């Protein structure tokens, strides 16, 4: 391994600790490093979107790290490309740049046949920090299907808006040209269609249909894991569509390289375009989602009620909207106005359940009681070890046991920066491997919080 690429590997280790996992997977992980002339370092980005983002957000930090790691740091260059050893050949179905061949003639697929939900549009999608990158990428794909970011791979937890964005792209494509053949489906439907085709000796028709599409939108791609024949068929469908410059969008609950039971060649192809994450929405976005949904339902929702619901329902958009619909239904059936007190009563069983879930607040309380200090000590600026170590433990537990982002955890600990949280998590991880006392404390606290 050359010196520049060896330094890059060390740099990646620091970046992995400093950057939230979803950001690292989206922006840093797709980069390839190769040694260039005169001991320089060439970083290859898979597309313009990643290259621009690295230039704007991460290049300064990468340069700083390389300066710290070497007395003679390599000169960095950024460009679009991939390592020649990993460049797909024509035989491996690299997406070609020739003019796309017209799909076979056939009946136009309607919105209904395409399984596209006309209510899921970009206009009805509430944008926030947690999803703005995914929305921006989806918008680009909708404007230039088959050209910008193909495939587009969106990953994140349940109920965060992945499917909404997928439908929004489908709606936009069909609105521009209703003759386009667009299909949205769950990955299990693809498997079921293939099995049915095998049973009826109709694989040629199956292949002809799927490979004639202008846009294929597949949800929950992780369900292909362990299904070898389905993966084989999807592999060839994927290649055929990309060769014809037809758009593919995939969603998953995890980063593609983390899907156990998925062939490496598929994982590799999923990274040919752009991979973006959607994270749980922050408080302001949750409030905006509730206000937008209430407006769609033509219901007046006081802002303080939206704030109350958003503060207590933090997991995902689906549960947030479910809570709102319950409040609206109760108000409709009882004829009462929607107030904070009414909402608290309407959601009392849900709020009781939420209260039993692990929150940053009860982590702080549990850690403070365990170490016999005050919660206020965890939030204060004091740095003596008797307080600093419990604070680091509490931050690490909050990252492990809640869905909160690093900035949100930092805010909950006296307005600290997210890098402080990262340092705390790294320190606790290090101590767990070297200190039996810290390991015992960690196990005890996990048992208390999980029990």
Curated annotation (Swiss-Prot):
GO terms for molecular function: ATP binding; ATP hydrolysis activity; DNA replication origin binding; lipid binding. Residues 81-106 are annotated as: Disordered. PROSITE patterns: DNAA (PS01008). Residues 1-72 are annotated as: Domain I, interacts with DnaA modulators. Residues 332-451 are annotated as: Domain IV, binds dsDNA. It is found in: Cytoplasm. The keyword Nucleotide-binding applies. The keyword Iron does not apply. ATP binds at residues 159, 161-163. Residues 81-90 have a biased composition (Polar residues). InterPro entries: AAA+_ATPase (IPR003593), Chromosome_initiator_DnaA (IPR001957), Chromosome_initiator_DnaA-like (IPR020591), Chromosome_initiator_DnaA_CS (IPR018312), DnaA_C (IPR013159), DnaA_dom (IPR013317), DnaA_N_dom (IPR024633), DnaA_N_sf (IPR038454). Residues 115-331 are annotated as: Domain III, AAA+ region. Plays an essential role in the initiation and regulation of chromosomal replication. ATP-DnaA binds to the origin of replication (oriC) to initiate formation of the DNA replication initiation complex once per cell cycle. Binds the DnaA box (a 9 base pair repeat at the origin) and separates the double-stranded (ds)DNA. Forms a right-handed helical filament on oriC DNA; dsDNA binds to the exterior of the filament while single-stranded (ss)DNA is stabiized in the filament's interior. Domain I is involved in oligomerization and binding regulators, domain II is flexibile and of varying length in different bacteria, domain III forms the AAA+ region, while domain IV binds dsDNA. Belongs to the DnaA family. This is Chromosomal replication initiator protein DnaA. The gene is dnaA.
């Amino acid at each position: 391994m050359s010196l520049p690429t060896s330094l890059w590997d060390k740099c990646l280790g620091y970046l992995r600790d400093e950057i939230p996992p979803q950001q690292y997977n989206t922006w840093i992980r797709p980069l390839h490093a190769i040694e260039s002339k005169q001991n320089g370092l060439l970083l290859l980005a898979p597309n313009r979107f990643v290259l621009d983002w690295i230039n704007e957000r991460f290049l300064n930090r990468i340069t700083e790290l390389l300066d710290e790691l070497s007395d003679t740091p390599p000169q960095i260059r950024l460009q679009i490309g991939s390592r020649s050893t990993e460049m797909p050949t024509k035989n491996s179905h690299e997406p070609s740049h020739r003019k796309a061949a017209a799909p076979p003639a056939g009946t136009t697929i309607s919105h209904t046949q395409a399984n596209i939900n006309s209510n899921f549009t970009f206009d009805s999608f509430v944008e926030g920090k947690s999803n703005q990158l995914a929305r921006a990428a989806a918008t680009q794909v909708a404007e230039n299907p088959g050209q910008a970011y193909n495939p587009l791979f969106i990953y994140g937890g349940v109920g965060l808006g992945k499917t909404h964005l997928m439908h929004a792209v489908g709606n936009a494509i069909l609105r521009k040209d209703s003759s386009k053949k667009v299909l949205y489906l769950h990955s299990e439907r693809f498997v079921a269609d293939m099995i049915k085709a095998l049973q009826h000796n109709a694989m040629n028709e199956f292949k002809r249909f799927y490979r004639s599409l202008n846009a294929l939108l597949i949800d929950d791609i992780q369900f292909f894991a362990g299904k070898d024949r389905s993966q084989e068929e999807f592999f060839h469908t994927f290649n055929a569509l990309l060769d014809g410059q037809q758009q593919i969008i995939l969603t998953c609950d995890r980063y593609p390289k983390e899907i156990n039971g998925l062939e490496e060649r598929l994982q590799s192809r999923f990274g040919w375009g752009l991979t973006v994450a959607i994270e749980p929405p922050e408080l302001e976005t949750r409030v905006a989602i509730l206000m937008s949904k209430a407006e769609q339902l033509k219901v007046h929702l006081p802002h303080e009620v939206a704030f109350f619901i958003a503060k207590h329902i933090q997991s995902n958009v689906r549960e947030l909207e479910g809570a709102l619909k319950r409040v609206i239904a109760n108000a409709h059936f009882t004829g009462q106005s929607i107030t904070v007190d009414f909402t608290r009563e309407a959601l009392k069983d849900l709020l009781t359940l939420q209260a039993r879930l692990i929150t940053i607040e009860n982590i702080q309380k549990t850690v403070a009681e365990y170490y016999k200090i005050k919660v206020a000590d965890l939030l204060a600026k004091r740095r003596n070890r008797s307080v600093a170590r419990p604070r680091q433990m509490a931050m690490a537990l909050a990252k492990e046991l809640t869905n909160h982002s690093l900035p949100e955890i930092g805010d909950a600990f006296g307005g600290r920066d997210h890098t402080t949280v990262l340092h705390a998590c790294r320190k606790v991880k290090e101590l767990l491997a070297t200190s039996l006392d810290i390991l015992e404390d960690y196990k005890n606290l996990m048992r208390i919080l999980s029990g």
